[in-house]
Curated annotation (Swiss-Prot):
Domain of life: Bacteria
Identification of the protein by name: Exodeoxyribonuclease 7 large subunit
Role: Bidirectionally degrades single-stranded DNA into large acid-insoluble oligonucleotides, which are then degraded further into small acid-soluble oligonucleotides.
Main location: cytoplasm
Disulfide feature: none
Subunit structure: Heterooligomer composed of large and small subunits.
Catalytic activity: Exonucleolytic cleavage in either 5'- to 3'- or 3'- to 5'-direction to yield nucleoside 5'-phosphates
Provenance organism: Rickettsia akari (strain Hartford)
């Protein structure tokens, strides 16, 4: 086409603007959308926000223009000396008779350049504190699990299979691109989207997953916007990007890092069979401990009953002794009074200063009466004290008080005590005594 244009227009006269427009048309129509790899040099950013630089290789130079909207989408700082791959269209600028590449997309090229960008970004975000947040614990039994990954491929299948195999739980999938120019924005929006759901629909934990790949393939997971989304998430995040040897910046901002997507599923839920076995073990231990405790208290109740019967018999004997002592003291007092009255009568017959003798004997009688009364009262108080003390001891050992604390006595139909499950195996009728009464229970 270019040769035809030259042949057809060789003798025609052009104005400067005409030839410039023709050259522009030829460049744009013949090259279209291209990719060019080279090293940035002579970078200048105008006050308008547009960037102008050269892309060089050895002695060859290609002028490039990166307009402000495109520059704002670039996820790393541009500097002289960085090797990049640029996609765009060739055009010409009539102002200085040169052709240039209008940038549509710009990515770092070469492992060294990418690692330098990654290390610089990591240091900056670490200084900001995005990797030092307080980690949110992963819930033991999440009711819902959010998974952010590609809807196609083996990763989502492995996660679903592993969760269903270990402990079936509701899975909410948010499909995203895991590679490419806009993938980091999609993943960040998915994290924010899960956090903005209503509480009833919000997952308990989020898994961000992708299979293995090169540093270029995993580059989206080093994006600053994605790191900030993980840092700000109120839902715990498990990152599972690549293989065990692959590390991305989202791993440092997540609440837990899994070496593989399958491992992330294992971190999210326990194994149901192991959990059931553990619960059965705890149940067995609890039943054994409860059985031992019941037997211990049954033994105590039987002992308390024996002590109660012994003390009841002892108190009855003491009460009888106290009554007999009281009767004896009363009889002695009456006999003494009668004796003194007899003496008084005999003295009254003697006529020897009867008034004096009467006063003396009356005083003596009063003293003796007071002594006997005091002695009797002391004896009675002593017995009453012992009686009260023994009654208190008896009440503390009374098995009825034990029943009031929530225990019960189980007897068989014949009145025999049943202290274990084995002892009750052949019984059909049970008498259960509580603190406030007794009930009869018939086994179906």
């Amino acid at each position: 086409m270019l040769e035809n244009f030259i042949a057809n227009q060789a003798t025609k006269e052009f104005s400067v603007s005409e030839i410039s427009n023709k050259i522009k048309e030829l460049l744009e129509n013949n090259f279209g959308y291209i990719k060019v790899k080279g090293e940035i040099s002579g970078l200048k950013i105008a006050s308008s926000g547009h960037a102008y630089f050269n892309l060089k290789e050895n002695t060859a130079i290609l002028a490039c223009t990166c307009w402000r909207p495109i520059l704002a989408k670039i996820k790393f700082p541009l500097n002289d000396g960085i090797e990049v791959v640029i996609s765009g269209k060739l055009s010409s600028y009539a102002g200085n008779s040169r052709y240039q590449l209008s940038v549509d997309n710009l990515q770092p090229a070469g492992l060294g350049a990418m690692l330098q960008i990654l290390n610089d970004r990591k240091a900056r975000l670490e200084k900001e504190g995005l990797f030092n947040k307080i980690r949110i614990p992963i819930p033991f039994l999440p009711d819902k699990i959010g998974v952010i990954t590609s809807i196609t491929g083996a990763v989502i299948k492995d996660i679903i299979h592993r969760i269903r195999e270990r402990f079936p739980t509701r899975i909410i999938i948010w499909p995203v691109s895991v590679q490419g120019e806009n993938s980091s924005n999609e993943i960040a929006e998915a994290i924010e989207g899960f956090n903005n759901l209503a509480e009833v629909n919000k997952p308990s934990v989020i898994i961000v997953a992708r299979g293995g790949g090169s540093i270029e393939d995993l580059w989206s997971f080093n994006d600053e916007i994605l790191v900030r989304a993980a840092y700000n998430s109120k839902i715990p995040i498990i990152s599972a990007v690549g293989h065990e040897v692959d590390y991305t910046l989202i791993d440092l901002a997540a609440d837990k890092r899994a070496p593989t997507p399958t491992a992330a599923a294992e971190f999210a839920v326990p194994v149901r069979s192991i959990l059931n076995n553990t619960l059965h073990s705890y149940e067995k231990i609890l039943l054994n401990n409860t059985s031992r405790l019941i037997k211990y208290h049954e033994h105590n109740i039987i002992n308390y009953d024996k002590i109660h019967r012994y003390l009841s018999h002892y108190m009855d004997n003491r009460q009888q002794l106290l009554d007999e002592t009281g009767f004896n003291l009363l009889d002695a007092l009456l006999c003494f009074i009668e004796l003194q009255e007899t003496k008084i009568k005999s003295f009254s017959k003697e006529r020897v200063n009867p008034a004096k003798i009467l006063n003396y004997k009356t005083l003596e009688l009063t003293h003796q009466t007071a002594y006997l009364s005091k002695s009797a009262n002391n004896t009675l108080k002593n017995f009453e004290y012992k009686l009260e003390l023994n009654s208190t001891l008896l009440a503390s050992l009374d098995y009825n008080n034990v029943l009031k604390r929530g225990f019960a006595i189980v007897k068989g139909e014949t009145g025999n005590f049943l202290s274990s499950k084995i002892a009750a195996a052949n019984e059909k009728i049970f008498n259960i005594k509580f603190s406030d009464g007794e009930i009869k229970v018939v086994r179906n």
